[in-house]
Amino acid sequence: MTKEELIAFEEDIAAVFNEGKIRAPVHLYFGNEEEMIGVFRTIRPQDWVFCSWRSHYQCLLKGVPKELVREEILAGRSISLCFPEYRIYSSAIVGGVLPIAVGAAMSIQRRGEDSKVYCFLGDMTAETGIAHEAIKYSRNHRLPIHFIVEDNAKSVCTDTREVWNQPRLSFEGADDEYISYYRYETKYPHAGAGVRVQF
């Protein structure tokens, strides 16, 4: 998909959400389309993708038909989109996919398969203990996995750097075999689309 198509998809979901037609949380992307498209240039059909509750772009770029993604979102499953036939999983639990992604990478390594795991996590999740353990374990065992830290500076409604009282995040600027980082600004709040009140 193109940058314009990704943006149009999210804008459509935002409009439907603000009309009150989606009775569940949504977490929208904006401003990181070029970075996301760049990451997916290296992701192959046989590779696995794990993400958090914000995963619309990943699903679309992994090849899931946009009609199917939209259908799942309208059914209230935006924060837990899973399409095993396309090898993509997401979870609404903070850090929930990290140990699963590491386990998948270990399975690939032990079976000698020609595939790799790509795990997306936000800037706040990247500061948690499970993230540090998952990344260190993967490095130590040279697992076929790559972590992508997406920094939108949001820890729900508080700036991540303020929450942790640190001007620079642990993986800020990282770019190596196991982890990459990018920062972007979004026009959407942490959850929802900025009009309808959501709890």
Describe every region a protein language model picked out.
Residues 6, 85-86, 156:
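Membrane-interacting alpha-helical segments
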Residues 141-199:
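Thiamine diphosphate
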Residues 1-25:
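Cofactor-/ligand-binding subdomain signature composed of acidic, glycine-rich
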Residues 2, 42, 125-128, 158-160, ...:
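Residue-identity detector for threonine
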Residues 14, 21-141, 165:
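Cofactor-binding active-site loop characterized by glycine-rich and histidine/acidic residues
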